[in-house]
Amino acid sequence: MELDLSLDASGVEIPEPLNGSLFAHDSWVPVLQQWIELVRSNPDLSCPSVVRQAPEVSLGLHFTNDAGIAELNSQWRQKSGPTDVLSFAALDDTPDWLEGEAVELGDIIVSVDTAQRQAQNHNHSLGYELHWLISHGLLHLLGWDHPDERRLSGMLALQERLLDSTGNVLPKGQRPVEIE
């Protein structure tokens, strides 16, 4: 499966020690491809049939700051203030996909400011936090949601599996988020 990734990190202050490596197109393409392939190739995991069949998928990955994501959060979710990640899915249930065409998944927007704070609060790296947030956004693009604790637990477990598949693991016993 091919991945057409549109990545935008313009206007984001990149922390000095990173030199932009976490915000580079070539860093994210293989990670996202592997995650999508893991979900779409496993019949036990929920995934739209068009994604399972598509030779190519495309998505947008946008890094912004708290002000940028707060504006989107207000406009699209009617919630004030920043959040960590937003996803805007492009897939719907219409059967108008033609075999052989690329499938547009949608867009993932991440606040680097919030990601930095959360990484510090959870005592892990910004890189791990970005992978965690982007995996969460990707699962939303693939139709996953968490309206209740059971579905949230399942989604968080799959996020851990995705990160583990690309070598983003935390020390034994440490969880990326606290499940209440």
Curated annotation (Swiss-Prot):
Co-factor binding comment: Binds 1 zinc ion.
Keyword line: Cytoplasm, Endonuclease, Hydrolase, Metal-binding, Nuclease, Ribosome biogenesis, rRNA processing, Zinc
Binding site for Zn(2+): H136, H140, H146
Cofactor(s) it depends on: Zn(2+)
Keyword Metal-binding carried by entry: yes
Major localization class: cytoplasm
Source organism, top-level taxon: Bacteria
An example molecular function term from Gene Ontology annotations: RNA endonuclease activity
Protein's cellular compartments: Cytoplasm
Pfam families linked to this entry: YbeY (PF02130)
Gene Ontology biological process terms from the UniProt entry: rRNA processing
EC identifiers of the protein: 3.1.-.-
This protein's GO CC annotations: cytoplasm
HAMAP family: Endoribonucl_YbeY (MF_00009)
Family under the similarity heading: Belongs to the endoribonuclease YbeY family.
Job of this protein: Single strand-specific metallo-endoribonuclease involved in late-stage 70S ribosome quality control and in maturation of the 3' terminus of the 16S rRNA.
Protein name from the UniProt record: Endoribonuclease YbeY
